[in-house]
Amino acid sequence: MSSIDPRAIIDPSARLADDVVVGPWSIVGPDVEIGEGTVIGPHVVLKGPTVIGKHNRIYQFSSVGEDTPDLKYKGEPTRLVIGDHNTIREGVTIHRGTVQDRSETTIGDHNLIMAYAHIGHDSVIGNHCILVNNTALAGHVWVDDWAILSGYTLVHQFCRIGAHSFSGMGTAIGKDVPAYVTVFGNPAEARSMNFEGMRRRGFSAEAIAALRKAYKLVYRQGLTVEQALTELAESAAQFPEVAVFRDSIQASTRGITR
C-alpha cells in the first residue's frame, strides 16, 4: 500500500505503484510514472514526462525531470527515463531531453548520484555508475557502465566517459575518456588506468596485464592514435577487455583525453 504524505501534491495524471512512498511537501507533476518500491523523500519536485522505475530512492530537495535551460528548447514534449535501484541524493538536478538530440535523458540501473550533482539534457548514464557530490554533466554527455566521477568533476557537452573509467576530484573533462582510463586535472589529463576498480570487479590478472600494456601503447610510446590502434589489434583479438578499450578510442568524436 502506498504511503503518500497528506502534505505532498500529486497530480491526478501521475501513475504511482501501490507501494510508492512520497514524503511531505514533495510535488509529483503530470505525466510522472513511479515504479514499485520507490521512495520519494520530502521537498522533491518531479516533473513529467518522466518514468521512474522500481526500488529507487530520491532524497530531499532534488529536482527531477525539469525543463532544460537549453535556449533551443521551446517546450516540445521530451522526457526523462530512470531505471531501477538508483539512489539520488540531496539537491540533485536532472533535466529532460531536447528534440534536437534524443528527446530523452536516460539513467540506467544501480547508480549512485550524490548530493548536488547535475545531469544535463539528453545525457545517458549507464549502470553501476557513481557521480560524487557536485559533479556536473553538460548536455549530451554519455557515461558508460561502472564509471566513477569524483567530486566537482565537470564534463563538457557531447563528451563520452568510458566504462570503468575514473576521474579525480575537481577534474574538468573536455574530451572523451576511453574505457578504464583514470583522468585528473584542469584540463583533464590521463594518468593511468583504474586497476583497483578492475580488481574489485573481478577482472583476471591476465586481462589487467593486457590492459596495462595497451595503455602504455596509447599513452607512453609516442605513437599516434592510429598507430596505437593498429598495434592493439592482436591483443584486442585475445582479450575482450582490450577490445573495449580500443573500441572506445575508435568511437571518439571529440578526441581522447591524453
Curated annotation (Swiss-Prot):
Coiled-coil portions: none
Alphabetically ordered keywords of this record: Acyltransferase, Cytoplasm, Lipid A biosynthesis, Lipid biosynthesis, Lipid metabolism, Repeat, Transferase
Query: Do the record's keywords include Acyltransferase?
Result: yes
Q: Which reaction does it catalyse?
A: a (3R)-hydroxyacyl-[ACP] + UDP-N-acetyl-alpha-D-glucosamine = a UDP-3-O-[(3R)-3-hydroxyacyl]-N-acetyl-alpha-D-glucosamine + holo-[ACP]
Q: Tell me the GO BP annotations in alphabetical order.
A: lipid A biosynthetic process
Keyword Lipid metabolism present in the record's keywords: the answer is: yes
Gene Ontology MF term list: acyl-[acyl-carrier-protein]-UDP-N-acetylglucosamine O-acyltransferase activity
Q: What does this protein do?
A: Involved in the biosynthesis of lipid A, a phosphorylated glycolipid that anchors the lipopolysaccharide to the outer membrane of the cell.
Q: How does it assemble?
A: Homotrimer.
Which PANTHER family does this UniProt record tie to the protein? ACYL-[ACYL-CARRIER-PROTEIN]--UDP-N-ACETYLGLUCOSAMINE O-ACYLTRANSFERASE, ACYL-[ACYL-CARRIER-PROTEIN]--UDP-N-ACETYLGLUCOSAMINE O-ACYLTRANSFERASE, MITOCHONDRIAL-RELATED
Q: Which family does it belong to?
A: Belongs to the transferase hexapeptide repeat family. LpxA subfamily.
Q: Could you identify this protein by its name?
A: Acyl-[acyl-carrier-protein]--UDP-N-acetylglucosamine O-acyltransferase
Which source organism does the UniProt entry give?
Ectopseudomonas mendocina (strain ymp)
